[in-house]
Curated annotation (Swiss-Prot):
GO terms for molecular function: exodeoxyribonuclease VII activity; nucleic acid binding. Heterooligomer composed of large and small subunits. Belongs to the XseA family. NCBIfam families: xseA (TIGR00237). It is an enzyme of class 3 (hydrolase). GO terms for cellular component: cytoplasm; exodeoxyribonuclease VII complex. It catalyses: Exonucleolytic cleavage in either 5'- to 3'- or 3'- to 5'-direction to yield nucleoside 5'-phosphates. One of its GO terms (biological process) is DNA catabolic process. InterPro entries: Exonuc_VII_L, Exonuc_VII_lsu_C, OB-fold_nuc-bd_dom. Its EC number is 3.1.11.6. This is Exodeoxyribonuclease 7 large subunit. Keywords: Cytoplasm, Exonuclease, Hydrolase, Nuclease. It is found in: Cytoplasm.
Amino acid sequence: MAANSTPEGPLPVGEVSRLIGGWIDRLGAVWVEGQITQLSRRPGAGVVFLTLRDPSYDISVSVTCYRQVFDAVADVVGEGARVVVHAKPEWYAPRGQLSLRAAEIKPVGVGELLARLEQLKKALAREGLFAAERKQPLPFLPQLIGLVCGRASAAERDVLENARHRWPAVRFEVRNVPVQGVHAVPQVVQAVKELDARDDVDVIVVARGGGSVEDLLPFSDEQLVRAVAACRTPVVSAIGHEPDSPLLDLVADLRASTPTDAAKKVVPDVGEEYERVRLLRDRARRCVAAFVDREERGLAHALARPSIQDPHRMIEERAEQVTALLDRGRRSLRHHLDRADSELTHTHARVVALSPAATLKRGYAVLQRADGHAVRDPGEVEPGETLRARVSEGDFSVRVDA
């Protein structure tokens, strides 16, 4: 329950420390898992001092135990080992310091570690951190490569030498960090984040030259896995441990079997690229030559056509054809005109011969009554009626006598 206090009636530091100690005492003994980061065994001392650290959250707590408790596991436990401790929390009031008094220490075996890693792997996989669609492609020719590795390590040498042998102009930004032990995870995470924050870094390589399962535990740490998953820069894992791949291999954008393999996958080989360029150049030359040859043959075929070799000949042939057609047209037109003229003359003669004027010229006359009606029958006129007689050269009046 909360202690009663007010601004006017605050609790003294000693009282607060005593209350905290009381709450901690009521907690009782607990099982705690962590990694031993410091170990102090003074000769002749009956107490062993340890520092137990949670690598995922970088939180540590002091642990004390009797020598006989530690001696029971001294052969298999040392700095960097993961252990499970059965301990009672203690509060040292004068310093306001929390510690654990261990009554039993158990090392975490490889089998148990692998089982826990498998559980973590499944949990992270359910979150989609290992999904293929999250993988980023590596740049074809990175200008600056970030390298996270141990100082003066074989992994660093393998990556640098092989990459520069393949592409001498490549540059590196190297971050030397512990790659095993209690300080590995926070420093590797920090190095990855620093390189990822730089705009000029094209790809990040995390390299280590293999090791035991325990040595490679930092590269399966959840904190590191999530840091790599959050990177905007492509990350290559080159831990070099085939049988049991750390979780970093699964979350990285590309897994390399060794640091040397990482160098080969990150940068192209200058000799291979020169050869590829040569082959492409030869192929382009052959394609251009074939194209030019094909076009030359087509041009030669076109030039061989009569219309190209002697263009005037075709025009002259057409001109002769036009002249012949004109002559034929004139002859045909003249023939049609002559025949039409003959027919017209013949028709005109017939018309003239059959016309009333020709009949009158032969001595005939046309009698017309006063209303202009031609007389065809004697019964149409009456005695004494005046008629108009029309002859070839004119007309005159006549009177009907009887």
